[in-house]
Structures are given as structure tokens and as C-alpha cells.
Amino acid sequence: MRIYLVAGELSGDILGAGLMQALKRRHPDAEFRGIGGPRMLAEGMQSLYPLETLSVMGLVEVLKHLPGLIKVRRHLRRDALAWQPDVMIGIDAPDFNLGLERQLRATGMRTVHYVSPSVWAWRQGRVKTIARSVDAMLTFLPFEAAFYARHQVPVAFVGHPLADELPLVNDRQAARTALGLSSTAPLLAVLPGSRGNEIRFLGPTFLDSAVWLRERVPGLQVVIPAASPARRQELEVLLATHPAREFVHLRDGESRQAMTAADAVLLASGTAALEAMLCHRPMVVAYKMAAATHWLAKRMVKTEWISLPNLIAQETLVPELVQEDASCEAIGEALLTWLGDETHRQATETRFAALHATLQRGASERAAEAIDSLVVHGRLPEEPTA
């Protein structure tokens, strides 16, 4: 079997390598060609360009690099047509891959897109383009699959790799011991984001909320895992003149450990909310942005919720506080509800564990099964979510 793969960034390389392993278990003689990173190369990928080609050109100075990006896509199209793979799989990088998939599918080649763009949230009209571009969409989340099914796009919900990676049962006390924190005092994990703008917009409010909460929860411990050295430096600047410096434990990375150790989590919306859910920890999701960005987002985003736990559950499980609503007091009150109501907290942890089990499906194997069925039988498995 010949398989053409195009990944555009580090996360795609990780997903691609897992998919290649699963496909090789089914087809030991499988050949792989396209664009991949070091993990995919280690699995036998023949990559025509470095992994960074698409991530740099696709996300940084897009207009400046557009001619080069178009040149790369034309080259890949010619190369794929000459090599004649059984299937072409675009891994994430939708702005680049969907165009290539559409061009190749028009020639009769089977195409698959692995990792849905957030078309369900904004610019929903893109689903028509996706329908013309792919023979199958492989999604991480069940509500994504439901969206594509409503629009008659062949889809398989394969589960989430992060859910596969995290255990269904975790050890709060072991995590606290590893972090050197008290095993009995209440603990709040604070994750203000991985981007500089998030620290700028959320950092001061999150620290104010921690102080507000500690005044009402004696002995409260607060741990902040910095997402990168740059974010740590920004947090250190904020803490230098902030009263929270007296009790905040600032760490390098260790976000998963911090969330597992915590009784509650305060975080920006994004993947961290999913990870907190998969650690089975109650959370408050808060987000602030530039006024113009918020004005635009309100008009473009079509979903009732912004956080993945609520979207996955299709109900409000965790508070979402956005822009003016994300005040120090509002955040503090929401956190106090979690910390002060053990029954509610434990019920939410149990619900998160159940959602975790729903997402823990062996994503790479499920994706390989769907691709194999498409190539061999010309269709997805009859019950891909069973």
C-alpha cells in the first residue's frame, strides 16, 4: 500500500507517526511519502520538505510567503500524481491541505483529512469546500462527527490521542508529592495560557483572583505551570510586584502534574481545558482579548460554548467567563463554588471520567481502520464509532 501524508507542524508529526505505526501493523509493506517530521521519518517516511515548511509559511507572514506555499503545493500535487498512492492523508494544516486534497480528489485519488478544522465554530460555509475535498474526515471529538454527518460528509469519530495518553484513573496525592506540595491543603492550579497575549490579558486578573480566593480559603496553595521559558519570564515580572508572590508556586511546564494535583483549575480556553477534563478536575474557564477581536469573535463564532468540556458534553459543566464577565470577583466566586462543595466537585470529576472513557478509543488504530476500509472497500466502516 502506498500512502501520501502531509503534516504541517509538530503536533501533526506526532499524529502522523502514530498513524503510520498503526497502518504498518495492518500493511507491513506500506510505503509513505509526502511531508513529515523526525517522528514520521523514523517510521519510514520519505519527506520532500522539512516539517517546518508549512508551519512557518502557513502561520507566519502568510502573504509574504504565499508564492512559495503555492509552489510547494504544486510540487506535491505533481509528485503525488506521479507516485500514484492508494490514498492521500492531510494531517491538520487545513489551509494548506484541503486545497491539495481537493486538487488530488478531482483526479480520482482518494483523500482523507485527519483532525477537523474548527468549521463547526466559525465559517461554517467551509464545510461545502471540505465536502468537495475529502472522501472522509477523521475527527477527534463526537460533536465534530455529528456536524459533518448533518452535512453529508463521510466521517469517522476516532477518539482523541490525548485521551489515549492520559490514564482513566489518576493519583492526586502522588502528583502533589512530585510537586513538593501539601497533601492536605486545598490546591488551585492556574494556567493563564501559552501565548504572550494571554499572559498580558489574563495574568493580572488570574493573580488577583488567586488573592481574592486565598482570603476566603485559608491555607490555599496555588501552583502556576509556565508553558515556556518566555511565559515564565512574563509571569515572574507580574509576580514581582503582586501580593500573590507570597504563596504562588511557579513551575516550568508540569501542567499535567499540576492539574492532577489540584482540587480546581483556573485556565484560559483551549486545549488546556480538554486536558483538565481528562485529568478529571473541575475548572473555571476565563478569557479576555482585545476589544476589536472580541467584537469580531462574537459575530463569527456560532457555538453556544467556547470550552471543549462543555462542547463535548453539549451542556454547561464548567463556568465560562469572557471579557467583562471575567472579573476577579466573578472568577473567585466560581472557584469558591468548586472548592466549597465537595459533592458537586466529586460528581463533576465522575462525569469527566465518563467523558474521558468516551474519547479513549485508540485514535491511531481507529484512524488506520477507517483508512484501510476506505482503500480496500471504498467506504468507511459501517459503524466507525462502535
From Swiss-Prot:
MF (Gene Ontology): lipid-A-disaccharide synthase activity; phospholipid binding
Coiled-coil annotation reads none
Q: A single GO CC term, please?
A: membrane
User: Reaction(s) catalyzed by this protein?
Assistant: a lipid X + a UDP-2-N,3-O-bis[(3R)-3-hydroxyacyl]-alpha-D-glucosamine = a lipid A disaccharide + UDP + H(+)
Alphabetical keyword list: Glycosyltransferase, Lipid A biosynthesis, Lipid biosynthesis, Lipid metabolism, Transferase
The pathway to which it is assigned is: Bacterial outer membrane biogenesis; LPS lipid A biosynthesis
Q: So where does this one cross the membrane?
A: none
Q: Does the keyword Transferase apply?
A: yes
Q: What HAMAP family does the record tag this protein with?
A: LpxB (MF_00392)
UniProt lists the family membership as follows:
Belongs to the LpxB family.
Biological role stated in the UniProt entry: Condensation of UDP-2,3-diacylglucosamine and 2,3-diacylglucosamine-1-phosphate to form lipid A disaccharide, a precursor of lipid A, a phosphorylated glycolipid that anchors the lipopolysaccharide to the outer membrane of the cell.
Identify this protein by name. Answer: Lipid-A-disaccharide synthase
